[in-house]
Swiss-Prot record:
Residues 128-171 form a coiled coil. Component of the DASH complex that connects microtubules with kinetochores and couples microtubule depolymerisation to chromosome movement; it is involved in retrieving kinetochores to the spindle poles before their re-orientation on the spindle in early mitosis and allows microtubule depolymerization to pull chromosomes apart and resist detachment during anaphase. Pfam families: DASH_Duo1. This is DASH complex subunit DUO1. Residues 167-183, 191-213 have a biased composition (Low complexity). PANTHER family: DASH COMPLEX SUBUNIT DUO1. Belongs to the DASH complex DUO1 family.
Length: 232
């Protein structure tokens, strides 16, 4: 009995499965309400994830580039240190080469001195050096004395020129003084001679001659004095 009931119930369910439903289904999918909003949020999450992944990838590329640049900088620093070492080595080699060149030059000089029959030793060399120094000092003193002599000669010429100018100026002023002195002296002597002649006319001719002689002598003396003053 129970088996029959199960059979009928199974047939009933099978018939319902092949029957056309009277109502359309309310939803074509089995998603609950609000599943669209959750889908939009998932898309945004996927976009942000992709953006972050791209940024992480770009950051990783930048880090690799920085590592490469740092490696290049380290290589350049090492190359710089190597170049400094090479430069120091070249400088040392140049110093050694210069020292060796000086040694060879000194050796050649010593050889020439030893083979020179006229070389009389280091003492003679010192004497020659001292003589050369004395000649140089004498030349300097001679030039200084020559310069002093030239300055003295120039000063003497300047003094002579100044004296000639003063003498020329005095000679130019002398003729005018002589003419004025002569006119004044002659007038004075002649007047005194006439006065003396008039006062002595009563005493006689001898007295008059004596007076005239005195007047002439006075005239001559005065003339000499006037010439002397004019010359001054």
């Amino acid at each position: 009995m129970a088996d029959e009931m199960d059979f009928y119930s199974s047939d009933y369910h099978n018939d319902d499965a092949f029957e056309t439903p009277s109502k359309p289904p309310t939803s074509t999918s089995g998603r609950p309400k609000g599943s669209g909003a959750q889908g939009g949020g998932g898309m945004r999450f996927d976009t942000e994830e992709a953006r972050e992944a791209a940024l992480r990838k770009e950051l990783e590329g930048v880090r690799k580039i920085n590592e490469v640049i740092e490696g290049m900088i380290g290589t350049l620093e090492r190359a710089k240190g190597n170049m400094g070492t090479v430069s120091q080595t070249v400088t040392n080699a140049t110093t050694l080469l210069n020292t060796w060149t000086r040694m060879l030059s000194q050796t050649e000089h010593n050889q020439r001195l030893i083979l020179n029959p006229e070389w009389k030793g280091a003492t003679q060399d010192l004497l020659e050096l001292e003589a050369e120094e004395r000649r140089r000092q004498e030349e300097v003193e001679r030039r200084a004395a020559e310069a002093e002599r030239r300055r003295e000669e120039a000063r003497r010429k300047a003094e002579e020129e100044e004296r000639r100018r003063a003498a020329a100026a005095a000679a130019a002023a002398a003729p005018a003084g002589r003419s004025v002195g002569r006119g004044t002296t002659r007038g004075r002597v002649r007047g005194s001679g006439l006065t003396r002649g008039a006062s002595s006319s009563a005493s006689g001719s001898e007295t008059t001659r004596t007076t005239s002689g005195i007047a002439r002598g006075g005239f001559g003396y005065t003339r000499g004095t006037a010439r002397y003053r004019g010359a001054k």
